[in-house]
Amino acid sequence: MKAVVYDSAKNFTVREIPTPEPKEGEVLIKIELAGICGTDLHIHEGNFLAEFPLIPGHEMVGIISSVGKGVTDFKSGDRVTVNPVVSCGDCEFCREGSPILCHNRKGLGTNWPGSFAEYMIATQDLVFKVGNLTPEQAVFAEPAACAMHGIETLGMKPGSSALVFGAGPTGQILAQLIAKSGASHVTVAASTKFKLDVAKNLGADAIYVMDRSNVKKSFEDLKAMRPEGYDYVIEATGNMAIAEICVPLTRSGGTMMVYGVGETTDTFPINAFDVFHREITIKGSFAEIDTFPSTIAALQSGRIKTDGLISHRFKLEEYGKALETLRSDKTAHKVVITF
């Protein structure tokens, strides 16, 4: 089979390798679509827990080609997606019922072979049928599951206001889920107008076009739009200059959530007294672990919409071009690999 194989950070080729055979409890999946996201850019650089050699890719949909011994819930021909996060089940956090915080967490496409290949192996406990979802819908299962975990972490109260920084695919899905969780008003702020137009079409109450070279003005404008602040402010860009203005934009008693993926060394300043006397809560939301069933149900019901999110399609052999498009093309939204 053909696969993207990294021998080290930044050093990859698309080459022929043996097609794996499913072992007991495993399924072999023929990939139909695989999504590229910002995490893959970090992995390309050797960050985000990447271990080489590696086949990257953690967003996918495909058809089961064959199953190993002991697999009873799946058969050849089933369209499925895969939860790429694997917890050990034995560390302190797993035993406490918090596997998302697992000390020994593994990830398909991070330190296990992922989906930028014609075929991939997954253990049956990580595999989910997608029913009547199209490949173009089902490929969003993983980013949507991350957004679903973010909503659970946020713990939103109905009637609240929210500000989402970032209109990438997960920012778009977060905004939808926030609105459907009973928010009275959702504002999405981003630097790309066409992405904000998509956000508006998908249900955002207000949009704001940011100038990332003048974050101070963006802060002033967003503060003027809601002088008392926003009950929930979600940073979904990974940009530390934007993260810095989140707490000041949070309403007293409100919550700021760090959701965007930055570099492992990134920091941003916080006024401790402001957090203290206004009783601001700061939360983080990382990946997902158990939200695939609810996410697939939300995609099937139309509660999560993905219309207009896929902007670019590339063949596996064009993986390098796909990465560069996501990194530098301002018209890129969701970039997918087709097979």
Place the predicted regions along the sequence by residue.
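N-terminal glycine-rich cofactor-binding segment
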Residues: A3-E21, G38-S66, T81-V82, P99-P113
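C-terminal hydrophobic helical "lid"/dimerization subdomain
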Residues: D221, E244-P248, I289-F339
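Mid-domain Rossmann-like dinucleotide-binding core that forms the NAD(H)/NADP(H) cofactor-binding site
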Residues: L133-R212
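Glycine-rich beta-strand-centered segment in the early N-terminal region that forms part
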Residues: P18-A34, N47-E92, L126, G131-L133
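Short amphipathic alpha-helix with an adjacent loop that forms part of the alpha/beta core around
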Residues: V215-P227
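Glycine-rich phosphate-binding loop and adjacent beta-alpha segment
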Residues: K200, D205, M240-R303, T338-F339
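NAD(P)H dinucleotide-binding glycine-rich loop of Rossmann-like/cofactor-binding domains
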Residues: C88-F165
